Amino acid sequence: MATTILGVGPGVFIIAVIWMVTLMLTVLLCRASGKARFWTVVVFTLALITTLILVFFPRASQTPAPAKEMQIVDTFFIGRYFLISIMSVIFLGCLFFVFVYHILEPVYAKPIGIH
């Protein structure tokens, strides 16, 4: 079975593109003069026939093929733990600097004013 995008197959997108092009050509040809105006009927009929063919003669079966049992393998195991250890060291260093420069910041007494 073909891959799906947003839960639908590629046929839905093909039909959507066909009808968008049909709508665009119909609007453009309706503004035309002479015999070109009657091509709107031909464009609409071709889009309708193509849509019916795609709907009634699908290439894939209705029931999906049975899924194979997939084995999940963590190939980035060592790299993930290396990154988390580096991030932990950086976090602890930042906590140390917050402690030194923010919490232990000296509070100076205000000078007493003489009247």
From Swiss-Prot:
Membrane-spanning segments: 5-25, 38-58, 81-101
Keyword match Flavoprotein: no
Subcellular location, principal: membrane
Its membrane topology: Multi-pass membrane protein
Subcellular location: Membrane; Cell projection, Cilium
Superkingdom classification of source: Eukaryota
Keywords of this entry: Cell projection, Membrane, Transmembrane, Transmembrane helix
GO cellular component: cilium; membrane
Classification via InterPro entries: Tmem218 (IPR026771)
KW Membrane (keyword) present: yes
Record-stated family: Belongs to the TMEM218 family.
PANTHER family: TRANSMEMBRANE PROTEIN 218 (PTHR31622:SF1)
Function, as annotated: May be involved in ciliary biogenesis or function.
The name this protein goes by in its record: Transmembrane protein 218
Species the sequence originates in: Xenopus tropicalis
Gene name of this polypeptide: tmem218
